[in-house]
């Protein structure tokens, strides 16, 4: 069945209100897209992260009359004559198949591949992490995840313990285990992340070496030789005393989820505990690494 798609530009301030209005008018689904190919900005606590220029995309049944909806939008004081919109007919597709076809195996560094579970691995002799890409957590396609995976691939992890702080899908912890780490600990505030990490560990036969905790449940005195945290600048800054305490003297640290302009501030924050390296960059994003100073 075909659909009618309405696309309109909005500020992040008004996107949620427009979404609610369109749903009330009869839209069957709403999605948000980046209007200017810009990095998503970091939200305040409790806010939904959106782009400054957000495109609201609404789907309606094919026989739906959109003229009254457009008139309603034009009457809104924050849109009015400035309303920019586009209406087009969308043919129905097997969207699950379309989504699956968009994911391919990706190589990170020299040894590591991230492979969707429905694809054949390109190099059976490589270190292959089999993943089911999901909507909520890391799949390796984002520059910050890629930066962390490349860093892990560059290390000799044989026999080492690692902490994945803010583990999400568990992709970094699982990759570290497949690269030779003896044990990994994943920490996340989200129950769904814990479940996703457990599923991906089982898919890669490393579940017996991965421990997963909510922050309030992590063991007292937990420390590791390697810690990677791919979260956001705000949490990295606020949680710095907690994060540094998880790394053994001489241990290695990687921090990502940072925009380029945030790297210097976060590096300075951690320099009291770590000998920090120069940042690595990919697109608009950065990764910081360092070695824990002796106590």
From Swiss-Prot:
Looking at the record's lineage, which domain of life comes first?
Bacteria
* EC main group: transferase
Database matches in Pfam families:
PrmA
- Quick one: signal sequence residues? none
Q: What is its EC number?
A: 2.1.1.-
Q: What does this protein do?
A: Methylates ribosomal protein L11.
What name does this protein carry? Ribosomal protein L11 methyltransferase
Species of the source: Shewanella amazonensis (strain ATCC BAA-1098 / SB2B)
């Amino acid at each position: 069945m075909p659909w009618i798609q309405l696309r309109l530009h909005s500020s992040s301030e008004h996107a949620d209100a427009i979404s609610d209005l369109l749903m009330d008018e009869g839209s069957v689904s709403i999605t948000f897209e980046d209007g200017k190919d810009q990095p998503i900005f970091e939200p305040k606590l409790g806010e939904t992260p959106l782009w400054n220029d957000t495109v609201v995309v609404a789907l309606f049944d094919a026989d739906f009359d959109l003229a009254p909806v457009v008139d309603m939008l034009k009457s809104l004081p924050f849109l009015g004559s400035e309303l920019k919109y586009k209406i087009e007919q969308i043919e129905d597709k097997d969207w699950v198949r379309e989504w699956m076809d968009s994911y391919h195996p990706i190589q990170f560094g020299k040894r590591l591949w991230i492979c969707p579970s429905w694809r054949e691995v390109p190099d059976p002799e490589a270190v292959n992490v089999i993943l089911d890409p999901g909507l909520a957590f890391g799949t390796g396609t984002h520059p910050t995840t890629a930066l962390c995976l490349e860093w892990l691939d560059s290390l000799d992890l044989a026999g080492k313990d690692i902490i994945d702080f803010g583990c999400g899908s568990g992709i970094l912890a699982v990759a570290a285990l497949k690269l030779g780490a003896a044990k990994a600990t994943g920490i996340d505030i989200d129950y769904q992340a814990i479940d996703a990490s457990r599923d991906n560990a089982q898919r890669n036969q490393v579940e017996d070496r991965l421990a997963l905790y909510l922050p309030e449940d992590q063991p007292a005195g937990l420390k590791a030789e390697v810690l990677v945290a791919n979260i956001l600048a705000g949490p990295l800054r606020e949680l710095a005393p907690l994060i540094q305490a998880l790394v053994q003297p001489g241990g290695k640290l990687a921090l990502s989820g940072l925009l380029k302009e945030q790297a210097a501030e976060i590096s300075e924050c951690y320099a009291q505990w770590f000998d920090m390296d120069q940042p690595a960059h990919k697109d608009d994003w950065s990764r910081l690494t360092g070695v824990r100073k002796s106590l």
